[in-house]
Regions:
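Eukaryotic alpha-helical solenoid repeat scaffolds
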Residues: 295, 299, 305-306, 312-315, ...
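Register position in tetratricopeptide repeats
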Residues: 34-35, 68, 102, 136, ...
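Helix-start (N-cap) detector for alpha-helical repeat units in TPR-like alpha-solenoids
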Residues: 21-23, 56-57, 90-94, 124-125, ...
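N-terminal leader/linker segments that initiate helical-solenoid repeat arrays
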Residues: 16-73, 77, 84, 368-376, ...
Length: 429
């Protein structure tokens, strides 16, 4: 009994010392957070939580540190604990909303932002993120409503016009989208995103000269954005400025060496101007990224045949035919390559296959694939539609010569990078 009393007396100063210094430890932790030493700040916040687990602040700030370390689940859990201790902290809902977004929990994020807006109805960042969540869920009517309220609060907030323009584009209302982008440019002529956004509309309207002009402005204001060079290359391509387009792809790849669209499209353009060996290099790179890309494989096969590598060409054609057994152009070009290496039997087999597919087509027998009528132009390629481009997800082999543009789902990724909230910490630290 005496030993227990003595032990308690000895421990009492230590416990009192820990309690007295909790505020100091909290200050050190917040300073570490301010200077972006997130791991160190978490260690100090842990000490405060161990000493005073009933406080909301250490959980809130630890969540902020965790979200900056991409520990989104941990950040969400800490925000839960902070909100349990104080349900009126707007920042906790904001950070939890951001953590949920990064985990694709958009419904939960929307709930958080709506709750936070009850306490802070004029918070621009909350309206911004709420709008983007609705856009991500393709609830465009709600997104428009959010953006209308945001603009009522902050009528000169150019991001809102850009986002509403994006919504209008999703709803195929290019006229209203153009008006929003025009407004954003009028308000801030030094925002490269506004020029780039309007250029997208002009590309869709086939107004390629004006699109190029807008992208010139965007590039002047932001020279390290590879996407602007990719888009300007597309505008130049449609104006038959192939050299200018290739130059833009070069610049885009200097910034982003792994850019799929840059390598694939530059390979196509290099092939068009006879720069076959360097075109092969581009398609080699594409196939390192996407080994099963049959359009890149077929284009490389054509280039290998053009440069005299007939066996390499046959290998590429055969891979494509294995994947697309009714692709007539594959048999035609493989027959030509087999003739070059003296494989008459193999060439005759491929030619017979082409003839049979032609007869089946004329007799109305469908092969269930995407076969082509070699008679159209005597090289195994059918007449293609008037479009010069295809979406990246388009797997129709007939479109193998078309310039590739990004899928809508890839364009949507910019929404995810435009959410706001991590900077909240500096306002509180």
């Amino acid at each position: 009994m005496i030993k227990k009393i003595l032990l308690a007396i000895l421990l009492l100063p230590t416990l009192l010392y820990a309690q007295i210094n909790t505020e100091r430890v909290m200050t050190i932790a917040r300073n570490a957070l301010y200077f972006e030493d997130y791991v160190l700040s978490i260690q100090y916040f842990n000490q405060v939580i161990n000493a005073k687990p009933y406080l909301y602040e250490p959980y809130f700030f630890r969540a902020l540190a965790k979200i900056n370390l991409d520990d989104f689940q941990g950040a969400e859990m800490d925000c839960d604990l902070a909100i349990q201790r104080n349900p009126f902290v707007v920042g906790a809902y904001q950070i939890r909303g951001l953590a949920r977004i990064r985990q694709d929990k958009f419904d939960g994020a929307i709930e958080d932002y709506k709750t936070a807006l009850k306490y802070d109805p004029e918070n621009v960042v909350l309206w911004h993120n709420l709008s983007l969540c609705h856009m991500q869920k393709e609830d465009f009517s709600s997104a428009k409503e959010d953006l209308g309220k945001l603009l009522a609060i902050a009528p000169r907030y150019t991001r809102a016009y850009l986002m509403r323009g994006e919504v209008n584009l999703k709803q195929n209302d290019t006229i209203q989208a153009l008006k929003d982008f025009d407004t954003a440019i009028d308000m801030d002529r030094y925002d490269p995103d506004s020029w780039a956004a309007r250029a997208i509309v002009r590309l869709q309207q086939a107004d390629y000269k004006e699109a190029e002009s807008d992208l010139d402005q965007a590039i002047h204001l932001s020279v390290r954005n590879s996407g602007n060079y990719i888009n300007r290359a597309l505008a130049r391509f449609h104006q038959n400025n192939l050299r200018g387009a290739m130059s833009d792809y070069d610049l885009a790849l200097d910034i982003d060496p792994n850019n799929f669209l840059g390598h694939y499209n530059r390979g196509l353009l290099r092939a068009q101007v006879g720069d076959d060996n360097r075109a092969i290099e581009d398609f080699d790179f594409v196939l390192k990224i996407e080994p099963d890309n049959m359009m890149a494989t077929f284009n490389r096969g054509l280039l290998r045949a053009q440069t005299g590598d007939y066996r390499g060409a046959i290998s590429d054609y055969s891979r494509v035919i294995d994947e697309y057994p009714n692709f007539m152009a594959g048999y035609y070009h493989r027959a030509e390559a087999r003739k070059k290496i003296g494989d008459r039997k193999g060439a005759e087999q491929d030619e017979f296959k082409v003839m049979k597919m032609q007869l089946d087509k004329r007799n109305g027998v469908t092969s269930g694939g995407n076969g082509k009528d070699v008679a159209d132009n005597n090289n195994g390629d059918s007449g293609q539609d008037s479009s010069k481009t295809r979406k990246k997800s388009d797997k129709n082999m007939e479109n193998y010569r078309k310039i590739v543009i990004a899928d809508d789902s890839e364009a949507d990724q910019r929404y995810k990078s435009d959410y706001r909230g991590r900077e909240i910490g500096r306002a509180h630290v």
